[in-house]
Every structure is written in C-alpha cells, then in structure tokens.
Amino acid sequence: MDLDSSMVPENDQDPIATSENQSPMEEKEEASEQQTGSESESASLTPSLPPPSQQQQQQQQQPQVTAVVGPRCAPTYSVVNAIIEKKEDGPGPRCGHTLTAVPAVGEEGTSSYIGPRLILFGGATALEGNSGGTGTPTSAGSAGIRLAGATADVHCYDVLSNKWSRLTPYGEPPSPRAAHVATAVGTMVVIQGGIGPAGLSAEDLHVLDLTQQRPRWHRVVVQGPGPGPRYGHVMALVGQRYLMAIGGNDGKRPLADVWALDTAAKPYEWRKLEPEGEGPPPCMYATASARSDGLLLLCGGRDANSVPLASAYGLAKHRDGRWEWAIAPGVSPSARYQHAAVFVNARLHVSGGALGGGRMVEDSSSVAVLDTAAGVWCDTKSVVTSPRTGRYSADAAGGDASVELTRRCRHAAAAVGDLIFIYGGLRGGVLLDDLLVAEDLAAAETTSAASHAAAAAAATNTPPGRSPGRYGFSDERTGELPESAPDAVVLGSPVAPPVNGDMYTDISTENAMVPGIRRTSKGVEYLVEASAAEAEAISATLAAAKARQVNGEVELPDRDRGAEATPSGKPSLSLIKPDSAVPNSVIPAGVRLHHRAVVVAAETGGALGGMVRQLSIDQFENEGRRVSYGTPESATAARKLLDRQMSINSVPKKVVAHLLKPRGWKPPVRRQFFLDCNEIADLCDSAERIFSSEPTVLQLKAPIKIFGDLHGQFGDLMRLFDEYGSPSTAGDISYIDYLFLGDYVDRGQHSLETITLLLALKVEYQHNVHLIRGNHEAADINALFGFRIECIERMGERDGIWVWHRINRLFNWLPLAALIEKKIICMHGGIGRSINHVEQIENIQRPITMEAGSIVLMDLLWSDPTENDSVEGLRPNARGPGLVTFGPDRVMEFCNNNDLQLIVRAHECVMDGFERFAQGHLITLFSATNYCGTANNAGAILVLGRDLVVVPKLIHPLPPAITSPETSPERHIEDTWMQELNVNRPPTPTRGRPQNPNDRGSLAWI
C-alpha cells in the first residue's frame, strides 16, 4: 500500500561537515570559546543586517534614524557523525518516523544523571518496489513506502555523548507504524495514530515513560469517541495542558477536524472543537508546533486535490474557552508537505518537504524560519517578501551542499536548546539514515528591534486578513510601549522552551494581558464559604485588636487610619506627599518588571506527563472547627527532655547537609523526622538570637531572589533551588541574597523540612538569607492547618507538641517586612486600611503574637488587593469578617507617601505564580505549585538584579506518578492525614476567581 506518489531517484552524496564522533553540544562549546568576546552575550546574538535594498529604503524613509538589525536568516545544517557501537543501535535508513526531544533526568554529575535525548520511534525501513531501504525503486513512478517494513522500534540519541542506542522498554509496545504522531510531555513521549502492515493504527494513546532507569510503555485509557484511526495528521501539547490532534487522512479523505484532550481533567476524554476564524482546509502531511505561550502553529500540508499548501495558521484559546484560528503573517517561501517543523523559542524552523509529482522543495527555500516575533518568513538568504521561484525539478542535483542536505521529505526534526536536529527521510527514492544539526543563534533575539526591522519588508506584502500581531504573532505591544519608555512594565513576546526545561514565555494565553484583570471560573458561588477558612481562625484576634484600638491601648494617629479617615472609604488626597507624587501610569525610573518570565516545563511521572489532579470548585467547603494544641503541662514535661547539650553550630550544618539536595531530595520513606527536639531547640535558639538583633523592617540590597508562600511543599522549594540556583557555596549565595515572604508551614506534607532548612540557612548565611513573617507563622493558625498535626505525627505527641510550641515562639521574633534599595517593599499580606507609612511597621515591637498585635499587624499579614484595578478604595475581604481588600488607589498612595516604586507581597495563590496589580506597582507572589493538590497553579520566584529589573521565574506542578496512582497503598500511607485536613479545611481559593456577580450587592456576611 502506497501512502504517496513516487520520488524520482537521484544519486546524491551528502557532505560530512562535522568532525568524527563529536557531539553537537561539544562543537557548540568549542565554537563559543573561539569567538572573540565570548563572554558577552550580546556579541554572539547580534542579528544580520537586512538586504542592501531594504537598508537603502529604510534610510530614505527615515534619514535621521540609525538602521536597526532584522531577523536572522535560516541556519545551515551539517552532518553529525554519531557513535553507533552495534548495528542495531542505529536507526538506519527510514522515513515516516517521529523524533521527539526529551529533557534530562536526575542530578547532573551523579551516576543516575541522563542528559537530554532524542527519541526516534517507528517509521518505514523499505520502499515499494525494492527490498532494501537504500536501493533504487524498480519503477520511477512508484516509490511509496512499503508498509510491511514499518517498525515499532525505539532508538535513543544521547545529545551529550553523541551516541545512538536501541531501547527495549517494558510493557506492551504500540503496533508497527509510520506516518504517526508523537509529542513530548516532560520526560514522556505520547504516540498516536499512523498506518502499518495491518492498515490504519487504532486511535489509542501510547505513552513511553522515560522517567525511570528503564523505559516502559503504557496505554492511556480515554473515554468516549475520539479522532478515530488516521495517519498523516499532527499532534502537539498546547499550553502544557491540551493534547491537540488535527487533520490527517482516515483512509478515505483528508480531514480538517480539531480534537483536544485536557490532561488536567480526569477521566481523560477527547473533545471535538469548533474553532472560530479562518482555519486550514482539509489536509494531511502538515506540521504542528506549539509555542510556549499556548499558540499552536500549523504549517503547510497537502489538500484534498493533492495540492501543496503554503499558509501557516495559528490556533489559540481565549480566556472564555473559545478556540480561534488566524492566518499567520508573512509570505512563505514555498508550499510544501511531508516536511518537518519545530519551534526554537519564537522561531519556527521548517525543513525540506515535497511538492508532488516527484518534486521537492529546493534551493534556499528548503530551510525556512517563521519568526513569530517579527511576523516574517526567512530563508537561508533573507526575509521573504514573495514566494521563491527557484528550481524545483527532481533532477536538479548539486548546488549548495547545505541545501542538498535538507532536500528531503518524510523526515523528522526536534530541538534541544538552540540546536535543531533532523533525522532520515526520503530523497529521490532513497531512504536516508543521516543525522543533521543546525544552531539557531537568533533564538533569543525576540526583540522589538527585530519587529521594527521586519515591518518594512512585511507591511506591503501582508495579504488582507493577515494581521500581524494577532495572537502574538508579532509584538504588537511595541507600538504601545516603545523602547523610549524603559520603565513601562511589559510582558514581551513568548519564547518557546529548550528541552532542558527552561523557557522564556509570555505569561499564558489564558491570562489577561492587562495587569490587574483576572480569569473567572464557574462555581464562584462556593468561594465565599471556602475563603472564610483562615479568617475564622483569626476573627477573635482581630476583634481584640479593634477593641484595644477603641480603648486607646494602641495609639494610631489620624494618618495611620488610612481609608477609615474619610467617609467615602477612600484615602484622603491630603495624605499624598506633593514632593513624591508620581504619575499612576508609569513606574518611576529604576524598578522594572522584565518583559519575559523564565519557566520550567512540567516534569512528569504519570501516563501523560503534564497531567495534574484537579478538583472542581464546587468541592470547596467552609473550614471546620479547631483542634486542641496541647496543654502547658505537656509542654513543660516535654521541655525536660532537653537533658543533653549540643554544639550550636553543628545542628545547622547537619540540617543543610541532610536537606539541601536540590536535585537529589526525595520524600523520606519513613515519616519519622530526622531531628529530635534537642536539636530543634538548639536550631531555634541560634536563629532566634539572629532575628532578635534584626530590625522589624529589614534593609536589603540587590541582587536578591524573592520567594512567596511555600506551605510545607518542600519538593517545590528544592525544584526552585535546582532550576534557579541554591543558597550554598556551591550555588549562588556568594553573589545574590535570598528573601522569603512567610507562610513556611501548614497545608503541605513537609513543613518541618521547610522551616528547619530555612532556619539553618539563616544561621549559616545570616547576612544573605532573610525571612519575614506570614499569617501562618502563628499558633492559632498553624494549630488548625497542618503544622501541629505534622509535628505530632512525625515526632510523637509529647515531643511534637513541644517542638510546635518552640517554633511558634520563634515565629514571634520574625521581621515583618523588608525594604530593598529603599525602592521596593516586601511584605506578606498588604497595606490594608491602616498602613500609610513604613514607619508604622517599623514601630511594631517584637516579639509579638497575633493576639497582642494591632490593626496594623492584621493588615500587614492578612489583607489582599481588590479583585482588579477597577475596584478602588476598601472592600470587605472574602476571607472573613473584619478583613479588607485594598484598591490600586491605596497602592499608589502608599508608594507616593514612602517614595517607593513597587510592593511585593505573597499570601494569595495565583495561577501563574505571580500576578501584577495597580498597573504593575504591586506583585503577588506564590511559590508552591498545585496548592493543596487542587489549584493546578504554577509556582514562581522573583529575581531582582542590580539594575532593579524584576525577572519572574516559574515552575509547573508535577503530575502524580504513574507508578503510584492516587489509589495505591504508597500514596495512601504518605498523605492520608493531609488529604483529610484539606477536605475538612479547604484552602482559600486561587486569586482571580471572583465572587458571583449576582451576590456582589449582598455583603451582609462580612
């Protein structure tokens, strides 16, 4: 059975451009060392100039403006001489296979470390009309693949060692097939569809799990109807969540349907989408690649009339759930199908392809790049302004050697960092077995300069309806916020992830691009009940603080009453200092939020990698009653256990040595905590001496990393240390400080690990590691939400209760805020109704308990911003009676009063790990992922450089391990008590899910 028409045979010799058995990574490192000024990043990323004619045109139009550089041309490819120790280790000649990049596993430098890999699956190893894979067909008109030669083999190319090997996974493999699809979900490869010796393959999803030392095949159970058997279709993981399957051929005709599987919703189910907008026609042999921000780009293909297509289409999901197609801007250099395409940051690299009738894409058009930041196509020569009319005859061999290398079809491509790999394919009736590589140095150049330089070339050649900038194809925000306004807070064009997990990305296509606007969700009528949880525990304390204020026990001058000083509920304008007032629309010179955020792709451990357990919002319930937290007698008896002495300095070192393992830490098999109460007492004594000597408001310097709520999710803390540097002499503690914004305990399963490690780091690096207090650093709160239970469960009732009391006494000494460079203030909650000046916080005397605190302390630890920038003044807080939310006007007033430019606070779970408010003058930060196993949120930190540019860095939630499903005994033993706690006392809902609009006029519950 033939899948396509023939390819006219040619006798080509592929040049060998790389040195023998040297990995592309090693070549890249050597090339970097040979460059002059290799230490300068900008030197290696300088893009090429536009063509001379374009330069002259730009100079004529703008004679007074220096010409800007444009997008780089497509890179050239060379052959990789990979190591193949045994014949079966090499994939050999084949076509119709898939090549998928998989990130590294394990800790680098250890025996268990496995570097980035390319996984090759399936494909055809023979052609119709000949028995060998590399021979000439018996007929020039019949060179279709021989389905009897389709395989289910798995081969692995280790990028670092430059070595091929054949894998023999456990489990039942998929049937032999070609023209199938595959995509990576973390360290897993999902395979679907295709055609083999028995005909069309079933629509089942097969997963190759590479998280373990030996890979394993799994079959994913999917309910309901799905795409059905098909081949020549496309599939990609969009937005780290949706598996999208599009088009192909069902054995009768080409298709144009779109199917989505939400990996965050169980049971798994395919859903047929009906996207709006102008989409691609029914076609097969196209390519689909997902950009990191959730934009899917479908390129090329062959329609029902066997005509090759040139257009590219973007598919994006709106915040309201709608999907929409849009035609990508720019002019493609050539139509094509059976090509390969892969994103490297914001640049889509397209290679090879067929034109039908035995012809292939040749000349400079055989390699092309769609620069989605600039909105233009480039080939190996220049920006493309019209379709190329080069030679496309099948007998035109010779010419540029690099072009000859990529003149092929039915091959496969994958990217590792800024390296693009191509394997195999078909050329002139000959199956290929070569591995090619190219390096895209322009991958990081997603700049407004590139957009401006390309605009002149693209403006007059953009067909009607192809609007650059739709769905972020180009950086349309450049026109709104030019580079001449350096202090504007901008979210820049997204850049796709390299395989090591790091990526630069626009902050999620599902999020509002306008600061202060949040997503909504169904079931919001349940949020009022859920959000009353923690406030119920603190309501008595808040009432006592108000009573003391009324009775004069706590003196608050008029200026300290904030919004309460005016009948309208808004702050008095007289409170704003005339000499410090700044425009509300632009942050003053100095502090800026970087236009990109660094994201770590979700690691995997389940059947579909990025799948995260998710509970419906209607499962949130009100908090239950308190539990007892022991008696003074039990605490006194426990204290008598301290009958031995230990060196003060030995305990912190023991803790750091035992716990600071960013890549190697695993939850202990035994829940018994590794420290006894004597050691914890020594650790607390050492840390308390340091905290007592520090001011209530810390004075810190940049550079510094800022962490939000951790809530006992120690694994997330280790992942953040692993991805973005750890506080050790082997890490980055010598040149950057660490600041933690509170809520170290409760909710998570490893509060003891979290707080003891942070205290040990404070003792070891007291001038570099800084901790301030959160609302859960209080006995009344952490008695209810997990910390006390964990202490008892892991240390025994007597020791556990004593340790819980001792750590809470230490919490009373924690500083309450931090000023960075006197321009940024960091706190846990917010400014509430009462805080107008930093001096109010500085005047709070420590140690202090919640019961003894004032309204200022309550606001500092408990208040939140309002729903969005349009809600000003003060509003009741959904957390519970007596608590408030504050609007953007309060933020601006506070910044003006104190000559500040930014407030960084934690306290609320936000979907992307960080969220802007008050036109970027306030950032909410949350570092724990998938809060309480229900929120499915990312975790983030902020990195403030010496230039006061704030860079968000994110990690995604980890999915449940496939080897330990939710119903397994291991998982049941591990977290039964914590699951019960979260069911009985659900967390405060994720920020951005507002109250039901029908209930907004009814706030009597406050």
From Swiss-Prot:
Alphabetized UniProt keyword annotations: Hydrolase, Kelch repeat, Manganese, Metal-binding, Nucleus, Phosphoprotein, Protein phosphatase, Repeat
Cofactor: how and how many bound: Binds 2 manganese ions per subunit.
GO cellular component terms listed in the entry, alphabetical order: nucleus; peroxisome
Phosphoserine PTM positions: 616, 964
Essential cofactor(s): Mn(2+)
Keyword hit for Phosphoprotein: yes
Region of interest (Disordered), residue spans: 1-67, 454-494, 552-579, 982-1006
Cell compartment(s), UniProt: Nucleus
Function as written in the Swiss-Prot or TrEMBL entry: Phosphatase involved in elongation process, probably by acting as a regulator of brassinolide signaling.
Residues of the active site: 776 (proton donor)
Tissue expression as described in the entry: Expressed throughout the plant, with a higher level in younger parts.
Any one GO MF annotation of this record: protein serine/threonine phosphatase activity
Family: Belongs to the PPP phosphatase family. BSU subfamily.
Main localization of the protein described in the UniProt heading: nucleus
UniProt cross-references to SUPFAM superfamilies, sorted A to Z: Kelch motif, Metallo-dependent phosphatases
Spans of repeat Kelch: 138-184, 242-290, 295-345, 351-398, 419-465
Protein source organism: Arabidopsis thaliana
Residues at which Mn(2+) 1 binds: 709, 711, 743
Family matches, as InterPro entries: Calcineurin-like_PHP_ApaH, Kelch-typ_b-propeller, Kelch_2, Metallo-depent_PP-like, MPP_BSL_C, Ser/Thr-sp_prot-phosphatase, Ser/Thr_prot_Pase_BSU1
Alphabetical GO biological process terms: brassinosteroid mediated signaling pathway
Official protein name in the record: Serine/threonine-protein phosphatase BSL3
Gene label: BSL3
Sequence positions that bind Mn(2+) 2: 743, 775, 828, 907
Biased composition (Low complexity): 38-47, 54-67
Catalysis: reaction(s): O-phospho-L-seryl-[protein] + H2O = L-seryl-[protein] + phosphate; O-phospho-L-threonyl-[protein] + H2O = L-threonyl-[protein] + phosphate
